[in-house]
Amino acid sequence: MKKFAFIFTIALGMLTTSCDSYLDINQDPNSPAEANMTTDIMFPAAEMNLASTYGDFYRITGGYFAQYYSHAFGTSNYVDYSQFKMSATRSSTDYTQLNQRSLKNLNTICQLAENDEEWGTFLAAKTLKAFIYQMMVDAYGEVPYSEAFDASNATPKYDQGADIYAGVLAELDEALSKASAGDKVATNFLLPGKNAGAWIQLANAVKLKMLTRESGVADVNSQIAALVSANNFPAGDVAWEGCWSNESGSLSPFYAEEFSTAWGSTQINVVANIAIVGTMQQKNAEGDVIFEDGRLAAFFEPNSSGVYTGGISGSNFSTSDNYK
């Protein structure tokens, strides 16, 4: 009996060890191990997480709230946005994507870059991090920041927007102080092949944008003046170009949402708003155009009569059929 118990104990021990070893192999073979993570691997992923949210949900809601967009005749997908409403249900997926993917990845990139003194990559990650926080604070007011990256804290506190702005600007200043124009930057899609000089310009632009938004409630005039005087900003558009194509899985986020027929839908919801059309095109009493902003034709298409006619916020009435 003792012999049997001894054998059983050995067998049980082997089984337990075997199970432990078996469970240890449950690592996604298509994902690199955490120990093998590099900034070159993580940076493009963080960018695409940002592009897919900012370029879709936040672009669309922001466009409606700013009265750039109105709703197409007879459709209802975004009528709530057109009425200046944004429910938690509608924004939950994108909000989670920014927090749990983009910001988390960018924070890890910052840590890796700082450990290796890769100050170009450090600045690039801090710049995108600042861009995201500026957008989220402007959209929600309060979001997790000071406790956001503590993995042991499942319920981080929501910081005040003013505190987040101050913290993010301080992070950006620190990164700018460490980076030099010739520093290398990890593989990325936004400014591919560029050294930190291009990212310094983008960081200055993001900083100016944040200070401008702060200027109504804080005295930041001297900081704005210093940035403007230095005049070290991007000379042209900074956009994700060359990474989209007219193929399933490679479409730009906004095009995929509104214009692609890949999902079997031909419905278009987003059209021009009368507010932006009236701002970019002025007519006299006879209806003749006396001024037209050159960007109008780049933003919108005229109706079948060659006229730009905007729709009214909060509606999807028949007038919306006259514009695009």
Language-model segment annotations:
Residues 2-9:
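Sec-dependent signal peptide recognition
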Residues 1, 19-21, 130, 168:
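Terminal processing/anchoring signals of secreted or surface-associated proteins
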Residues 4, 19-70, 89, 97-100, ...:
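Membrane-proximal, proline-rich intrinsically disordered regions
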Residues 36-40, 72-324:
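Structured, solvent-exposed acidic/aromatic patches
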